[in-house]
Amino acid sequence: MSSSITMSEPRLNWDVTPKNGLKAFFSPENYKDHSMAPSLKELYILSNRRIGENLSVSASSVENEPAVSSATQAKEKVGMILLPKPRVPYPRFSRFSQREQRTYVDLLAKYAKLPSSSKTVGTNTNEYLQYLDMKKHVNEEVNEFLKFLQNSAKKCAQDYNMLSDEARLFTEQLLRACIEQVKKYPEFYTLHEVTSLMGFFPFKTEMGLKLEKTLLVLGSAKFVKTAFPSMPVKLQLSKEDMSSIETPQQKAEVMHCDISKDPNAEKLVSRYHPQIALTSQALFTLLNNHGPSYKEQWEIPVCVEMIAVEGSKPVKVIYINSPLPRKQMTMRERNQIFHEVPLKHIISKNTSVPVSAVFMDKPEEYTSEVDMPTEAGECRKIETLENLDMDFDGDVTELETFGVTTTSPPRSPSSESDSSAPLMTDVHAVPKIAAVPLAPATPVAPTMPVAPATPVTPTMPMAPATPEASATPNITDDSRSLCQILMKQLQKEKQLFSGVEGGPEGCKNKDDQGLEPCGEEVPSANAKSLTQDNEVHRTEGISKESDVGVLCTNDERQGGQGNANNPNNTATASEAAESEKGIPCGSDTDEDCLIIDTESRSCDGKTADLGSRPNSSAQASAGNQATTTVSEESCVLKKPIKRVYKKFDPVGEILKMQDELLKPVSRKVPELPLTNSEESKQPPASEQPSAALDAAPWPKSSWPSAFQKPKGRLPYELQDYVEDTSEYIAPQEGNFVYKLFSLQDLLLLVRCSIQRVETRPRSKKRKKIRRQFPVYVLPKVEYQGCYGVEALTESELCRFWTESLLHSNCSFYVGHIDAFTSKLFMLEEIASEELKEKLAALKISSLFNILQHILKKLCSLQEGSYLLSHAAEDSSLLIYKTSDGKVTRTAYNLHKAHCDLPGVPSSLSVPWVPLDPSYLLPYHIHHGRVPCTFPPKPLRPAAQAKVGGTRMPTRNHRNPVSMETKSSCLPVQQVENEGVARNKRKIM
């Protein structure tokens, strides 16, 4: 009996392989994780609970509720902010203490999002300087921590290959539906051309995609939901939700809706004639090419068509469709495709609004290229005649020795050494047309000869000769002629600038009013010249620099009608002046004809014509013309006084004071008219006025901007034309927005959409006025939620940048999703200022040059179907063309290349993304832990360490991760499983 019992019982086997504590089942850590006893922190919370806190609860409600221990309730209360367990133990402690980390976390939460010019920074300067100093030291440890995370990702490479069954099923269905869409394109292609992405054109830094017009808006958009009761939020769809969202087949059809077969786009192309029509996804793909790696692989179908135009030859249009599915796709990208669907459903409200009511673009960014910044416009003030020291109502014909001597006393000692006193130039219209204005140039000194000038009007006398040429008779007539020339010149300048300020009608009215010439002889003893020093009056808002004798010439009228009183004297004076110097009449310091162009319309509504340099042939043939426009005059600086007034050039001052109103032109070329004002030489830098008030009223913006609108390239009838939405086909779900952009000399028709809409104040000043604005939410799947928030990649930044180009009024959000739990743990809003700082990491000028080169290359293609192909990590671009029934062995089979699901790239490197140390998660704030830093060294024993949220460092038998840094001061005891375990089985 006993023997049978002993035979049935199993025998004890003591030959157990020693595990040396590596896989010990009953360890202190397992005991703490699975123990039902409350921790010290939970006991502390229970002890501090107010007495009688829950006495008001009725007995019936207590009986109906399940029995839950107080310790469990405390665990639930504290468990939301427990410090997460790292994937790999930390190799060392932080160089900062717990107190220092807590201080920096508080400063980071206060100043991380504030600009340095904010009021908070100004009132707390010392605290802000402390934050900057601590940030400099923290960044040193951040670099070491990021290297630790990169090595941790290599040890945990299986984390990046994780894909749930639900996500795998959805992505397979979607990708197969996209593969079916590929079959609608031609099957065989032959290599047509190979080119570089960058091209061989000169690199242009100032380039941008600029909005010309929003052509058509169709459909509606749902409102966005950005506030949630608690975070994180589980991204899980119920059966009812699955029935309301679109299927993978429907999503694939929307993704590959070709613009070449869009009837709405065809109508718009036939009306506006853009060179290129493309989708927003194609635009993003062409912009998302970042050198020098160019790691993005893509294929884009292109269709080149010729459309008929009434009354003209056919026009070529290039249709760029959405890119085809990728040949290789990482698990991170598959995860993002899957989580994008539930994220859009959770952040969407049931209400929607028509897209036509959405403010998609900012009006203040649609400034023309010739418009000035607001700062320059505010600091320049229009001066009135009351603010000037000059008396324009005085009769200068009664002055003595007019044009011979200068008797005005100088204001400053510097002006006493000048050979002639400067004269103030007025650029504004004088209210009284009969008043005699001051000439824009002072009479020259007696020692300086003045070359003659051609008359301005048929009744004007010619300018007299200089004192050196006074041997000719009728000196009083010459003085009278100079007087009349100066009066008529200033009167014409008054009319010139009043035409700019008053419009075409004002110019016409003042041109019709003529002045009678002076008939009396002006005694030379009473002629005086009005002078003024070269002192700059900053309080009056205008620079009063010295001027020289500037005489207006007319190229069209010479001789017979120029001086009815003494034409011989005028001719003699001209010959004497020219023979004395032996050089022709020049203008300014560069011997160029200076043309005063006010960009105003002449009396008949036409644009003003530019004058030319006077010559002998013009003087002989232009005597028959009796009328001319104001804009045909040209102010000529006399060559003999060039060496004296080289420093004080009145024409240069006019150019700088009236930057765009008075445009200099290049030297006259016999073959080409003087129409290019950009080639004229500018005045020397020494003559630039120091005061900011001398700025032009409409200077051309020179700073590059991707959001700046140029001059309208559309005709006026197309700019004001409003499309009838009833003539177009609206989408069944979602919306379509058709916009016309310009890229240098190319017109682009872009079909885009608005993802979501939000209601917010129209501006900071108009907070009571609320409008609807577009919103774009980017899903971002992250694998390092236990350490912090991952930074935005180049592709994600390019996506935000592309959306900001399409809709400048768009708001941006990033939905941070934990890849392991499928929870939305953070919905971050990116402000416009913050986005501009982030976009500084992109080489925007390089991306624009790549886009322009590709589009220029497409414009050179002939009619047909093409395929743009770019391989990963390749700087070249392949252009394939459809085979016309000829299939060779080198032909590219598009259908065969996309016959199966995209594979996973076989790369040895892990798709690791660095963290952004400026983002604080709730556990960072609660525990006072600086993001992207090692844990601080505990100051107390293990019992107190758990109260602070961390356990005492215990001896770790696992191999630590290498740091690859210069630091070798690793602690003896490693941090073990900080925070809550992943598979914690504690009974709640």
Curated annotation (Swiss-Prot):
Q: Which InterPro entries match?
A: ICE2_C (IPR019535)
Task: List residues, modification Phosphothreonine.
Answer: 589
Stretch list, region Disordered: 402-422, 500-587, 604-633, 673-706, 942-968
Q: Which residues carry this modification: Phosphoserine?
A: 322, 587
Query: Where is the sequence biased in composition, kind Basic and acidic residues?
Result: 534-547
User: Which GO annotations describe the biological process of this protein?
Assistant: positive regulation of transcription by RNA polymerase III; snRNA transcription by RNA polymerase II; snRNA transcription by RNA polymerase III
Q: Does the keyword Transcription regulation apply?
A: yes
Q: Which residues form a coiled coil?
A: none
Q: State what induces this protein.
A: Down-regulated during neuronal differentiation, probably by NMDA receptor.
- Compartments it resides in: Nucleus
The cross-references to Pfam families, in alphabetical order and at most eight, read: NARG2_C
In which tissues has expression of this protein been reported?
Answer: Expressed in brain, kidney, liver and testis.
Q: Name one GO cellular component term.
A: cytosol
Stretches of Low complexity bias are at 413-422, 563-576, 615-629
What does the record give as the function of this protein? Component of the little elongation complex (LEC), a complex required to regulate small nuclear RNA (snRNA) gene transcription by RNA polymerase II and III.
Family stated for the protein in its record: Belongs to the ICE2 family.
Oligomeric state and interaction partners are given as: Component of the little elongation complex (LEC), at least composed of ELL (ELL, ELL2 or ELL3), ZC3H8, ICE1 and ICE2. Interacts with ICE1 (via C-terminus domain). Interacts with ELL.
Q: What is this protein called?
A: Little elongation complex subunit 2
Gene name of this polypeptide: Ice2
